[in-house]
Each structure stands twice: as C-alpha cells, then as structure tokens.
C-alpha cells in the first residue's frame, strides 16, 4: 500500500488524475475478477498473495488521488461560486466515506448470513462452511469489488476537472484571490 501511495504523485502528474483514477480502477477490477479463478491450493495461495499485494499497491494509489481530487473540487467550487467551501467539501467527503464503510461492512455481513455462513461468536470455534458461504466469501473478494471499481470508472468518466481545466481554474483563482 505504501508503494502505491509513493507512486501516486508521479503517475498522476504524468497521466492526469482522472486518467490515473480510471486506469487504476480498471486494473483493480481485472485483478479482482482474476482472483476468483485462482484455485484453492498451495500454488493458488501464492497467487492469491501476489494478487492481494498488487491490489493493495493499486489501492495505495487511490487514497491520495481521491483526496487530491476533493481539493480540485473545492478549488472549482471556489472559482465558480466565489466562496470557499473547502471545509464543507472535505467534511462531506469524509462523512460519505464513513457511511460507505458502514454500509459496505454491513452488506458483507448480510450477504454472508444470507449465504449460510456459520459462526459462533461466543466460543470463536471454527466451523466447516457450506459451499454457498465459501462462494460468497470468494465473491466478496472478487466480483463485488470489481463491480464497485467499474461503477467508479463510469462515474469518474464524466468528471470534468482535467489537468488543463485545473490549470485554468488555478489561474483564475489566483486573480480572484488577489482582488479579494
């Protein structure tokens, strides 16, 4: 994950934030789908580990990238509406992430329960899981994250704040701030 964070700035500087976001999410969706087809075996274990390392590195790129895109939205809003709304944008983004984590975590547990996952929280005892629960676990590690990444690609495809547009906004903001 830290490697991805370190790579974020040079990659986004070279290709642009929007392009980087889309490319990283496409790569995440491909790796996630491939994860489903890795056999459960000794060799498969190492392939799963490698896939998760790559997924973690790509996720590392996403974290700073998304926050820098929030800053771009803040600059865009300030330039367009002539008022700073940085606090509102960052706090609502943080709240949305918290809601997403809560809903996503709950949804995973609801899916596992619906698929017959067996647990005994009192003893922590391990159980042999039914095939439906094992399939659900594999989908939670593959197809579901891939679908979320594809949705993110579709949403960000219409994101208008390209590198050129942000250079324009930054120049206008500099003038606007000097006049205030």
Predicted segments — roles?
Residues 1-180:
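Membrane-embedded alpha-helical bundles of multi-pass transporters/translocases
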